[in-house]
Amino acid sequence: MQSSSDSVSALLSYTQDPSLQKIGYKILNGERLQESEGVTLFEKGSLSWLGALANFVREKKHGNITYFNRNFHIEPTNVCVFNCSFCSYSRGYAHREEGWELSIEQMMHIVKSYDGKPVTEVHIVGGVHPKMNMEFFLELLRSIKAHRPDLHIKAFTPVELDYMFRKAKLTVQEGMQMAHEAGLDSLPGGGAEIFHPEIRKQICDDKVDADGWLTIHRTAHQLGMHSNATLLYGHIEAYHHRIDHMERLRQLQDETGGFNTFIPLKFRNKDNDMQHIPESSIIEDMRMYAVSRLYLDNFPHIKAYWPMLGRQQAQLTLSFGVNDMDGTIDDSTKIYSMAGSEEQSPTMTTAELVQLIRSAGRTPIERGTLYNVVKDYSTVALESIDA
């Protein structure tokens, strides 16, 4: 029986393009790819070839393990001072009656609805509301921790934090320290979109730039917090913009080691200012996941956000470098459903997630936010699994 590396070596021998052969052997030998080589993967690599290489790297890092967690989302508001072209979610302050604004009491009601349930994480992100200030969110963090100290709070993109800090006249260091002391445990990856100014200027010119986003994550890492990172793909960007974005993330990861997971996010074109742009194909989606796994050699995990992709496509990514399927979600997010995502009421029971992972030939492992193993579900009977 051939080993995984033997199988990939055999596949490489069928590649006629010398530039791809060189890249393939670098990957087999664990060598870092250059930016130009990342672009070459996108432009020239066949899907089967990319998938085999990405799966080789994935299995070298994680074997058959596929992680998931039990989590829920709170979205405090969709009222937002910014006007991103790709966003189907936000409403301007002048039209806030069309959106929602949750009080701390309402958000605590959501938290308390999970009392006695085995969730390990609450994920809090939303629009940038001009009246929801730093003190409001510090009080929210303190309230959650006082009620349920064991619940990991992953909250606030750099877009939200940058606005909070500037309004409160705080430095990034001061603001992050205050949030951390109030109960913030880690940062999600949102708000990154595309770092390259050529694209960022066209799709989200008025919010925090790439340097600001990276500075907030760097500061979080320096405080001992971990975070995730995202990239919004499939709109007006070119392949070199994607690689530039991943290169900046890779450099910060070399510096701090604080990123856990990279999450490619597919652009959806429903009800936004970019609805004239066709969405990417399944083939392009899988290409994005595979190249992400190959280029981001220092990121431990690549995640498929199943509410955005849909269950079956997310399952397919497990053959293209992905080793994390996110969480149960429990129909608690509207950010992508309002943009036309595959899952309009995103919720999966733990048993459904376990079965989805098993049917792809992978080993389902429930994790905490920081990838501590909560439970191995490889041999657990589905009917015995709690929702």
Predicted feature descriptions by range:
Residues 1-48, 115, 247, 253-387:
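Auxiliary Fe-S-binding modules of radical SAM enzymes
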Residues 95-109, 129-180, 192-193, 208-212, ...:
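Canonical radical SAM enzyme core domain
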Residues 132-158, 181-182, 207-226, 279-298, ...:
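Alpha-helix-loop-beta-strand connector modules within alpha/beta enzyme cores
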Residues 70-72, 95, 125-135, 197, ...:
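Glycine-rich, proline-tolerant flexible connector loops at the mouths of alpha/beta enzymes
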Residues 153-155, 176-195, 223, 255-266, ...:
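Non-cysteine beta-strand/loop elements that form the S-adenosyl-L-methionine
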Residues 122-132, 153-164, 191-197, 204-205, ...:
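Conserved strand-turn element in the central/C-terminal portion of the radical SAM core barrel
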Residues 39, 49-93, 99-125, 187:
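N-terminal pre-triad scaffold of radical SAM enzymes
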Residues 30, 54, 84, 124, ...:
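Conserved, mostly hydrophobic/aromatic
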